[in-house]
Amino acid sequence: MSKAVSIAKEQVSAVIEAAMKKAMAAGMLPEAELPAFTVERPADRSHGDFATNAAMASARAFRMAPPKIAAAIMENLDLNGTYFVKAETAGPGFMNFFLGSAFYSDVLTEVLTKDSAYGRSDYGNHRKVMVEFVSANPTGPMHMGNARGGALGDCLASVLDAAGYDVWREFYVNDAGNQLDKFGLSLSIRYQQLFAENPPELPEDSYHGEDILDLAKEYAKEHGDELMHVTEEERRKALVGFGLPKNIAKMKADMEKYRVHYDRWFLESDLHKDGEVMAVVDYLRDRGLTYEKDGAVWYKATEFGGEKDEVLVRANGNPTYFTADIAYHKNKFDRGFDLLIDIWGSDHHGHVARMKGAMNAIGQSADKLDIILMQFVRLMRDGQPVRMSKRTGKAIQLGDLLDEVPVDSARFLFNMREANSLLDFDLDLAVQQDSQNPVYYVQYAHARICSILRALEAEGVTPRNCTAEELALLTAPEELELIQHIASYTDEIIGAAKDYDPVRITRYVIELATKFHKFYNACRVKGEEESLMQARLTLCRATATVIRNVLTMFNITVPTSM
């Protein structure tokens, strides 16, 4: 939380405890051990700027009704030397505290002093956390679910970083197993269809996308029909060796264009090459957590909350995808991460329990793995669902989206709804350059402040640091409401980190822009007496700082003019 908010909470606790002790000494309250109580910021500011349940929390200790306890506390309450100018009781014993100008002055001073660091905290205590997200199969182009996952994962990682975690972003490339076998088969058949008189047909469960045909044609253009004269195994190996790196390179290019920068692209094939997949089987076997049946190696998943035991190694000697997944998560812990966050599509919900159970099986706590399930995306145009790209006539891919929609809009709009909610992405809204587009609305607030500052500087007015007395001139409801919102930014970051919910920050900054526009329409800056003008300029600069910090954190551009 911001320093001023932290001080205010501490002051409420201190004056309540002092008043209780004073009331006990005066015989107004019986002698008792002081109880624990909470100090919160009410959602409804008519209930005060801070509120405490101290009277209700101490009812059992004092054996008195909360309203009587509250009355005794109020009679002995001393607010001198605090941020607060008054306190009052409400309801069944709540005590509400109202802030004075010193708090508002300190908030603005703190924002301008900390500048780009405002909002950051040590809440995470530098714990090492890995956020693994997108992790799309490299067998085809990335889709809208990957677009949402990219924005969600990257912005969540940034929120965690701001909250004091040591964050690592990772993309797990599934370049092994059944999906890759299917990829090789599909490429081989498409390649043969270019040259053979009676080529094989694609099986129903193979990849039918045009991207597969495009890769086959590209190989044929470079190498001709040379693979028609080799074995099927050699043909598949050559085509996978040609197509897979191209697909991975395209995925990396799309993510870079999307402003998603990973610390590592981790290849599943490396787990197999390094022997880590079979090593995890041996690890579980040594712990007595496997058995053999029908020639396969089984893991006793039911001992860790699973509905059924799971195959680790098939009868043909090949490990399952689940085995590789366990090995990958063990690898993460072996690299020293304290907390793992995976973002999966909601269609993987059935795998959550068995994956968390496997964490216990490898000697870790299931609580160290958090899995966020993300709902699907529906693209909308003219109020109707749309699946095909206007430009290509094919299914819309991430690359297509980024060609049509500004990256700023995509990153912001994909974080407008919580992960567990279906999201309608409005393609028309995303390209609008007006206040209907939420990211434009927020960016415009920042640009408007920059415009105000430029206009005044052109007239010879230079913003300066204000005294507490000058900042005390900010008394209009719109001014105080805006400062209160600015003061809550650090708490919002911490809350978003706790809940794994960057959407909370998206909503926060939209509301900040709304409160700024409301302030600007109600309170003149230019033309006021110099001290008041400078105080309002300070409020403008503080608002711009917070907007800039949010947009920068989300890797969205921060325009100074629009």
Predicted regions and their residues:
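Short, charged, solvent-exposed linker or helix-capping segments at domain edges/interfaces
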Residues: 106-111
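Non-catalytic interaction-recognition regions
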Residues: 2-105, 116, 120-562
